[in-house]
């Protein structure tokens, strides 16, 4: 029993010894160029065209993570950038171990940067403390005690921005401007209210010569025209509808 157990244990040990040798033999060298690289996610693929000094007929994709890149600063690869690398075979496929530029130089990297990091930065323009008005901090970081409310336009504590006299003088409302212009312009109508249609303007007295000219065109004298108009006016006011038309015909 003891011998069998020893022999069984001795059988497992020889099987475990070759594993490090197999891992070491899997580390290979290759050259190629960056196929694509996602700067936000931090990974991409290398298109390997040469393996252990022998060219490949068909390029092979090798996974690359930014932690494997040999360079300073923000680590990334530019599409089409030539690289040299060591890689191994894993359960997921070929993975790079160390990636450098040609001749072991640092990688160049991509000019692109993640958009999320730039959006997170606060823009200093327009930021100010709502407590004291300072530009170098915000209200939650203000060292002064709570200050009284004041007008945001002229910084006065006597009124709020809605009642600021300086703002109202500087920017008069458009409606008041239009109303003032309409009131300032005199009525330019030269026709009397009877002829012009009642614009609400006081027209100058109608000259006698113009009345005579109008009556001559209509074939009546000024007296007849005025008398006819005065006789028809009360009848039109007292009667409506078809009766008015009958009166005009007769």
UniProtKB/Swiss-Prot annotation:
One biological process GO term for this chain? pre-miRNA processing
Q: Where is the composition biased (Basic and acidic residues)?
A: 210-219
The highest taxon in the source lineage is Eukaryota
Q: Where are the zinc fingers (CCHC-type)?
A: 127-144, 149-166
Q: Where is the CSD domain?
A: 29-102
Primary role: Suppressor of microRNA (miRNA) biogenesis, including that of let-7 and possibly of miR107, miR-143 and miR-200c. Binds primary let-7 transcripts (pri-let-7), including pri-let-7g and pri-let-7a-1, and sequester them in the nucleolus, away from the microprocessor complex, hence preventing their processing into mature miRNA. Does not act on pri-miR21. The repression of let-7 expression is required for normal development and contributes to maintain the pluripotent state of embryonic stem cells by preventing let-7-mediated differentiation.
Against PANTHER family, the record matches this protein to:
PROTEIN LIN-28, PROTEIN LIN-28 HOMOLOG B
Protein name in the entry? Protein lin-28 homolog B
């Amino acid at each position: 029993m003891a011998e069998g157990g020893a022999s069984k244990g001795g059988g497992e040990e020889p099987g475990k010894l070759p594993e490090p040798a197999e891992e070491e033999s899997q580390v290979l060298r290759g050259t190629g160029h960056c196929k694509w690289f996602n700067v936000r996610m931090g990974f991409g693929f290398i298109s390997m065209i040469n393996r252990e000094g022998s060219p490949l007929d068909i390029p092979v994709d090798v996974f690359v993570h930014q932690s494997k890149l040999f360079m300073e600063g923000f680590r990334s690869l530019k599409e089409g950038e030539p690289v040299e690398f060591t890689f191994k075979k894993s359960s997921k496929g070929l993975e790079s171990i160390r990636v450098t530029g040609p001749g072991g130089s640092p990688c160049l990297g991509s000019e692109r940067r993640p958009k999320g990091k730039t959006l997170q930065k606060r823009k200093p323009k327009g930021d100010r403390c709502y407590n004291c008005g300072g530009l170098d901090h915000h209200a939650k970081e203000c060292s002064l005690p709570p200050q009284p409310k004041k007008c945001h336009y002229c910084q006065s504590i006597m009124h709020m921005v809605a009642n600021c006299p300086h703002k109202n003088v500087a920017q008069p409302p458009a409606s008041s401007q239009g109303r003032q212009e309409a009131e300032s312009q005199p009525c330019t109508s030269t026709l009397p209210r009877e002829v012009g249609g009642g614009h609400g303007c006081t027209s100058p007295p109608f000259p006698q010569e113009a009345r005579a000219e109008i009556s001559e065109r209509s074939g009546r004298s000024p007296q007849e025209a005025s008398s006819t108009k005065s006789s028809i006016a009360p009848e039109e006011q007292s009667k409506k509808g078809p009766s008015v038309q009958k009166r005009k015909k007769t």
